Amino acid sequence: MNYVDQNKRKWLSLGGIALGISILPNSVLAMVSTPKPRILTFRNINTGERLSGEFSLAKGFSPAMLKKLDYLMRDKRTNQVHKMDPNLFQKFYNIQTNLGLRNAEIEVICGYRSASTNAMRRRQSRGVAKNSYHIKGKAIDFRIAGVPLIKVKSSAESLRNGGVGYYPTSNFIHVDTGPVRTWKGV
């Protein structure tokens, strides 16, 4: 086979593919090219506030939604707001996806924690880390309404990124964006 015949075959193949794509219904093309909206719903159990929205857009995180999430995750004692690590929210989306959930209500027990609140908590409980990831805006304690805690723990651990603490007696899971590690608390 000579060079011209090989080129002809390549062009005919590409033309066939292009023709095939052009006759697909627009709805199929839209499904293929449009990413799924990444929506999360949170309820802060300390304030009663609820927030639901798309945290991630096609070109990255939604700055407006992240700002609202920062406010929702604020220190419950001092009312101080701190920028949260956006990767936490991606982690929550992945946890839900692993569980086969969409937009389930995530109950926030603790998001950001100021240094003074953390010091106070350390005096009350030896289980509070001196350099907690909560102080850095890189940790959230939570549970998902209606989902057994052990399933949420397994889903979080399967991601193999960041820390996962399991607190069955206190009824929450801790996730953070630090090094990979797991532990069981009370």
Swiss-Prot record:
Lipoprotein listed as a keyword: no
Residues engaged in binding Zn(2+): H134, D141, H174
Domain of life: Bacteria
Source species of the chain: Haemophilus influenzae (strain ATCC 51907 / DSM 11121 / KW20 / Rd)
EC top class, as a word: hydrolase
Name assigned to this protein: Probable peptidoglycan L,D-endopeptidase MepK
PANTHER family per record: OUTER MEMBRANE PROTEIN (PTHR37425:SF1), PTHR37425
Metabolic or biological pathway, per its Swiss-Prot or TrEMBL entry: Cell wall biogenesis; cell wall polysaccharide biosynthesis
Keyword set includes Zinc: yes
EC numbers for this chain: 3.4.-.-
